[in-house]
From Swiss-Prot:
This is Serine--tRNA ligase. Its EC number is 6.1.1.11. Keywords: Aminoacyl-tRNA synthetase, ATP-binding, Cytoplasm, Ligase, Nucleotide-binding, Protein biosynthesis. One of its GO terms (cellular component) is cytoplasm. Catalyzes the attachment of serine to tRNA(Ser). Is also able to aminoacylate tRNA(Sec) with serine, to form the misacylated tRNA L-seryl-tRNA(Sec), which will be further converted into selenocysteinyl-tRNA(Sec). Consists of two distinct domains, a catalytic core and a N-terminal extension that is involved in tRNA binding. It comes from the Bacteria. GO terms for biological process: selenocysteine biosynthetic process; seryl-tRNA aminoacylation. PROSITE patterns: AA_TRNA_LIGASE_II. NCBIfam families: serS. It comes from Rickettsia akari (strain Hartford). Homodimer. The tRNA molecule binds across the dimer.
Length: 425
């Protein structure tokens, strides 16, 4: 959520920043609604003060009867009625909060202006792409190996699900352990194993609600399946004041993730690129405003290191204003090369959300010996999605006979297995 105080004091700049997100000017409407709310709040405070004064007079009166006593009693009753009316007006005046809840984060100055992904900026590349490489797609390879099942799975669970079998299931497990080891041992992230069900308020705090309600799976009793472990990990600091010396706080977690893929009809309908359920290792960092820019590079490097160790070609893109996520002020997308598609595809997003999530969840820190608190900055990164990493391995490590060579760093995690071959029935 954006700061109403900042909007109030920077209306022209606010509209300018919104325009970079391709949103019409909102400052006038927000200022009007804010003025109404502040007027009601001011009246409530005045009446509360008047009630306090008159109640004190009543308490100090020697005689608890008589015209003067009864007149003041009537005044207090009238004040209470008026307060009830004003507080009801304030509770009903939800338009301002509803409007603020739908506004995305303000882009950082370094973010390029642009409408869509075609305007994203190339930051760096890693590895060489070979236009003459074997180019079967992952679902062809996995199906031929008899280790990836879509058909029978669809009969049981529907479209956009997959069952991995045998050595591909083992590869999935190996990748999880490998990624967690790198992030914890080399980058000092603290491992967590969180629930996959959260309450709606946790989804609100992280920015998924209310704007993206249709993109998640909801239960009938106020819970939602997480679309990413970020939801739980950032909420660890909700409604807390953190000692400055404990920052940064870095968390890593592997979880299944669940997305309805609303609005993705017709996109990536084959294979493992876009599923309703997928596993992902997620990174979250909680830090200070002064350190968040450095932390953004740090958390991005942690994600990149996984691909480097797997020797997978990739590039890093700085997303433009029109392609960034709702809660982000600056985002790097890491795109891995897929020979089967002959293109780079997104495998990770690494975002600095500034104080946007922190304001929603009231997460603050303070210096030792100080009573003043400041909103933390939150950052997140995919570190990485297991399915898309498997896709990249299958396509980049495929052999003429359809077998898959195991990347060197995974051989020990695979119990010494060096190649995945066809599994017989």
């Amino acid at each position: 959520m954006l700061s109403i105080k900042w909007i109030r004091e920077n209306q022209e700049l606010f509209d300018e920043k919104l325009s970079k997100r391709f949103i019409e000017p909102m400052s006038s409407k927000i200022a009007m609604l804010d003025g109404e709310k502040r007027k009601i709040t001011s009246l409530i405070q005045e009446f509360q003060h008047a009630r306090k004064v008159k109640s004190k007079i009543l308490g100090n009166m020697a005689s608890k009867s008589g015209e003067e006593f009864e007149a003041i009693q009537r005044d207090v009753k009238h004040i209470n009625e008026k307060l009830e009316e004003l507080e009801q007006d304030l509770n009903n005046n939800n338009e301002l909060n509803e409007l603020l809840n739908m506004l995305p984060n303000i882009p950082d100055e370094e973010v390029p202006y642009g409408m869509d992904e075609s305007m994203n900026k190339l930051v760096r590349t890693y590895g060489e792409t070979n236009p003459n490489a074997l180019n079967k797609q992952h679902f062809e390879l996995g199906t031929k190996l008899n280790l990836m099942d879509f058909e029978q799975t669809a009969k049981i669970s529907g479209a956009r699900f997959v069952t991995l079998k045998g050595d591909l299931a083992k590869l999935e497990r190996a990748l999880i352990n490998f990624m967690i080891d790198v992030h914890t041992k080399e980058f000092n992230f603290f491992e967590m194993s969180p629930p996959v069900l959260v309450r709606d308020n946790a989804m609100y705090n992280s920015g998924q609600l209310p704007k993206f309600a249709e993109e998640s799976f909801a239960t009938t009793n106020g819970y939602r399946l997480i679309p990413t472990a970020e939801v739980f990990l950032v909420n660890i600091v909700a409604d807390t004041i953190i000692p400055r010396e404990k920052l940064p706080m870095r968390y890593v977690a592997y979880t299944p993730c669940f997305r309805s893929e609303a609005g993705s009809s017709g996109r990536d309908t084959r294979g493992m690129i876009r599923l309703h359920q997928f596993g992902k290792v997620e990174l979250v960092s909680i830090t200070t405003p002064e350190e968040s820019k450095h932390e953004h590079e740090y958390i991005t490097n942690s994600s990149e290191t996984i691909l480097q160790k797997l020797n997978l070609p990739y590039r890093v893109m700085l997303l433009c204003t029109g392609d960034m996520g709702f809660a982000a002020k600056k985002t790097y997308d890491i795109e891995v090369w897929l020979p089967g598609q002959k293109q780079y595809r997104e495998i990770a997003s690494c975002s600095n959300c500034g104080d946007f999530q922190a304001r929603r969840m009231k997460a603050r820190y303070k210096e030792f010996g100080s009573n003043e608190t400041t909103l933390v900055h939150t950052l997140n990164a995919s570190g990485l999605p297991i399915g898309r990493t498997m896709v990249a391995i299958l396509e980049n490590y495929q052999n003429e006979d359809g077998s898959i060579t195991i990347p060197d760093v995974l051989i020990n995690y695979m119990g010494g297995l060096q190649k995945i071959t066809t599994h017989g029935e």
